C-alpha cells in the first residue's frame, strides 16, 4: 500500500481534483511496479516562486523547476513491521505543470501525473541523470505507467 498526503504551500492537506489525481496515479504506479513494502510519502503543491526558493536553498540551482524530490536515505528510514516506510517528499510546481502542458501539447492532468510519477521514481532510487541507460529505463517506465493509467501524450 502507498499512503500519499497532498499538501498545499501552507502545509494544509488538500482533497481537490489535483490531489485526487496524484493519489490515484501514484497508487496505480505502486501496483504497476508490484511493490511489496508499505510506503508513505508527501506531495507538496507549490508555485514557481516557492520551488525556486527550494531549488536554490537545497540544490544550489537558482531557477524554478517542475518537480523536486527529497528521498530519505535507506539508512535514515525506520523499519517497523506493519508500519508504512517513509519514502520522502515531492514538491511540484503547479505553475510549471500548466506551462509544460501547453508547451508539450497535452493535458494538464497528464503533465501533473507525469511529474508525480517522475518524482515517485526518484524517491524509489531511479536517477535519469546517471547514464543514458538509466534515463531510458526511467522514462520508459514513466511512459508505461502513464499509458497503463490511461494518460497518453
Curated annotation (Swiss-Prot):
Domain of life: Bacteria
Cofactor(s) listed: Zn(2+)
CC per GO annotation: cytoplasm
A GO term for molecular function: RNA endonuclease activity
Family stated for the protein in its record: Belongs to the endoribonuclease YbeY family.
PANTHER family listed in its UniProt record: ENDORIBONUCLEASE YBEY, CHLOROPLASTIC
Protein name from the UniProt record: Endoribonuclease YbeY
Gene source species: Oenococcus oeni (strain ATCC BAA-331 / PSU-1)
Gene responsible for this protein: ybeY
